[in-house]
A protein has these predicted regions:
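Strand-loop-strand motifs at the edges of beta-sheets in extracellular beta-sandwich domains
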Residues: 75-94
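Short, exposed coil/turn segments at beta-strand boundaries within extracellular/luminal domains
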Residues: 108-116
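Short, solvent-exposed loop/turn segments enriched in Ser/Thr/Gly
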Residues: 54-60, 96-104
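Solvent-exposed, low-complexity, repeat-rich "mucin-like" stalks and linkers
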Residues: 32-71, 117-121, 125
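A recurrent domain-boundary module in secreted/ectodomain proteins
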Residues: 10-35, 388-401
């Protein structure tokens, strides 16, 4: 019988019984014995708050013990789920509408009470990821701490340590400090964990809670095939060593093989009347406070927003081999920075943003020419007491239909 506590009890001292509920699932319920019980504790699950996402398995690592058998007694139409030895897996029907959904799991241990677990999830067919950083650490299904020192300016001082990227007070805190004679900075990346295809939109609520001269921070989305194939910086900001104008603004930009092989590496500028900078900037009220930074990537344009207001756009100006820009482009030349570039080979690669899958990165960094400093790591001036912080309240990644 089912007791007032919702558990199933058996009255007789036999090995067990099987029965069928009107859900068509066959379930087993053994005799209850003292000292044994079912344990099922999913990680990253908060009732009525946790999302599940369409088009992929949603894995909730779980402590599962003393479970002899388990069956799902209630699932939304078209949904699938399974309980494994160390995880709960939920697969929504991609045709489901946005809303709240519930699944029920009947589990029992040998000689124990049978328990019914109810899990309540949120589902949005357009949503790829929502993370409010409400736990005690990053969700390692989607994020890892970055410590790949590949020589790029922003990665100079990345430690990969939790001390530089803790989760606390409902936010991801990225810290840049100078201690023990060295700079230490934090970054978190979704590389090799969660990637998504265009068209998409990324929204991120973030704040520069502590600023120092020479610090800079960014939220960006990067092609899985490499930064040069369409990196999009959703927001960048920092304290310039000399320019108060730079410091007062937030910045956004995109990179592609074409712009990286123009003399200035900045402009779509081969055709009169169609020049468009790859970068933009804006002055925000109370720039250190929380703002929502966004980007939309479609076949027509990459468009940036701050608090819902458009601040820049890079359009898909379709290049062809009939353009004079292609006909008269040099095979190779030298950029304003003294680097060898290849304009002709890359002329047609000005809008690769629809060709790649992307992942997200958050970071805080120190030094480099971006903030008016040196591009030599060992020459970044030491600043005792340096303590900058960039806080991420939440990130939302969505499909665009």
């Amino acid at each position: 019988y089912i007791g007032a506590d919702g558990r199933v009890y058996f009255r007789y001292s036999t090995k067990g019984m099987t029965f069928r509920r009107n859900t068509i699932y066959d379930l087993g319920a053994p005799v209850e014995k003292a000292g044994t019980s079912v344990v099922l504790e999913p990680k990253y699950y908060t009732e009525g708050v946790s999302y599940v996402y369409g088009g992929r398995e949603n894995i909730f690592p779980a402590v599962v013990s003393d479970v002899t058998d388990a069956s799902f007694t209630s699932l939304p139409d078209g949904w699938r789920a399974r309980l494994e030895k160390d995880r709960l897996v939920v697969i929504p029907d991609t045709e489901s509408e946005r809303g709240n959904y519930e699944i029920q799991l009947f589990a029992y241990a040998e000689g124990a009470k049978a328990d019914i677990y109810t899990f309540r999830f949120k589902y949005d067919p357009a949503l790829i990821l929502y993370d409010g950083f409400d736990g005690s650490d990053i969700d390692d299904r989607y994020w890892r701490r970055f410590n790949d020192h590949h020589g790029t300016l922003w990665s100079w001082f990345q430690t990969g340590d939790e001390a530089q990227s803790p989760v606390a007070d409902g936010k991801l805190q990225l810290k840049a400090v100078y201690e023990d004679g060295a700079y230490k900075t934090g970054a978190v990346t979704g590389q090799n964990l969660l990637d998504y295809e265009p068209p998409f939109r990324v929204d991120c609520r973030a704040a520069m809670s502590r600023r120092e001269t020479g610090f800079w921070c960014a939220v960006w989305t990067v092609p899985t095939t490499g930064y040069q194939n369409g990196e999009i910086d959703i927001m960048e900001a920092g304290n310039h060593y000399t320019s108060s104008d730079f410091t007062s603004k937030i910045h956004c930009t995109c990179h592609n093989p074409y712009t990286l092989n123009t003399p200035s590496k900045k402009y779509e500028g081969f055709r009169p009347g169609q020049d468009q900078p790859q970068s933009g900037s804006a002055v925000l009220d109370n720039p250190n406070d929380y703002h929502i930074y966004s980007v939309e990537v479609t076949d027509e344009a990459v468009t940036w927003y701050a608090d819902g207001v458009q601040i820049h756009q890079y359009k898909n100006i379709r290049h062809t081999t009939d353009d004079n820009g292609y006909k008269y482009a040099a095979e190779s030349t030298t950029s304003s920075a003294g680097e060898t570039i290849y304009p002709k080979a890359n002329y047609l690669k000005n809008y690769p943003f629809m060709e790649n899958r992307y992942f997200a990165i958050f970071d805080i960094a120190v030094g480099s020419s971006f903030v008016g400093g040196t591009n030599k790591k060992d020459e970044v001036p030491a600043t005792e007491g340096f303590n900058a912080q960039f806080d991420i309240d939440w990130i939302k990644i969505s499909k665009i239909k």
